[in-house]
């Protein structure tokens, strides 16, 4: 395997995981903060807010997992070789 392709694949895998984690991380922090604020304002709606929050956090986390899958594909099933 060409060392340049190997090095580029490792760098791309790191960037894939890093960049795929930034957006969902910011989004999850914002969503959790807003959920806590909403529960503080309306404690009777806690169950509905919590359920919606957990569902949205799962969708956001899926984006990070997709970045991990791309990184693993670049490392172990390199399409450029």
UniProtKB/Swiss-Prot annotation:
The keyword Cell cycle does not apply. It is found in: Plastid, Chloroplast thylakoid membrane. It comes from Solanum tuberosum (Potato). F(1)F(0) ATP synthase produces ATP from ADP in the presence of a proton or sodium gradient. F-type ATPases consist of two structural domains, F(1) containing the extramembraneous catalytic core and F(0) containing the membrane proton channel, linked together by a central stalk and a peripheral stalk. During catalysis, ATP synthesis in the catalytic domain of F(1) is coupled via a rotary mechanism of the central stalk subunits to proton translocation. Key component of the F(0) channel; it plays a direct role in translocation across the membrane. A homomeric c-ring of between 10-14 subunits forms the central stalk rotor element with the F(1) delta and epsilon subunits. It holds the Pfam family ATP-synt_C. Its main location: plastid. Keywords: ATP synthesis, CF(0), Chloroplast, Hydrogen ion transport, Ion transport, Lipid-binding, Membrane, Plastid, Thylakoid, Transmembrane, Transmembrane helix, Transport. GO terms for cellular component: chloroplast thylakoid membrane; proton-transporting ATP synthase complex; proton-transporting two-sector ATPase complex, proton-transporting domain. GO terms for molecular function: lipid binding; proton-transporting ATP synthase activity, rotational mechanism. It comes from the Eukaryota. One of its GO terms (biological process) is proton motive force-driven ATP synthesis. F-type ATPases have 2 components, F(1) - the catalytic core - and F(0) - the membrane proton channel. F(1) has five subunits: alpha(3), beta(3), gamma(1), delta(1), epsilon(1). F(0) has four main subunits: a(1), b(1), b'(1) and c(10-14). The alpha and beta chains form an alternating ring which encloses part of the gamma chain. F(1) is attached to F(0) by a central stalk formed by the gamma and epsilon chains, while a peripheral stalk is formed by the delta, b and b' chains. Gene3D superfamilies: F1F0 ATP synthase subunit C (1.20.20.10). The chain crosses the membrane at residues 7-27, 57-77. Signal peptide: none annotated. The record marks 61 as: Reversibly protonated during proton transport. Belongs to the ATPase C chain family. This is ATP synthase subunit c, chloroplastic. In plastids the F-type ATPase is also known as CF(1)CF(0). The gene is atpH. It is a multi-pass membrane protein. The keyword Oxidoreductase does not apply.
């Amino acid at each position: 395997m060409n060392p340049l392709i190997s090095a580029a694949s490792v760098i791309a895998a790191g960037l894939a995981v890093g960049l795929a984690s930034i957006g969902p991380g910011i989004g999850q922090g914002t969503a959790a903060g807003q959920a806590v604020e909403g529960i503080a304002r309306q404690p009777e709606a806690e169950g509905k807010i919590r359920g919606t929050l957990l569902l949205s956090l799962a969708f956001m986390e899926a984006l990070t997992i997709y970045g991990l899958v791309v990184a693993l594909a670049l490392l172990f099933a390199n399409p450029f070789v």
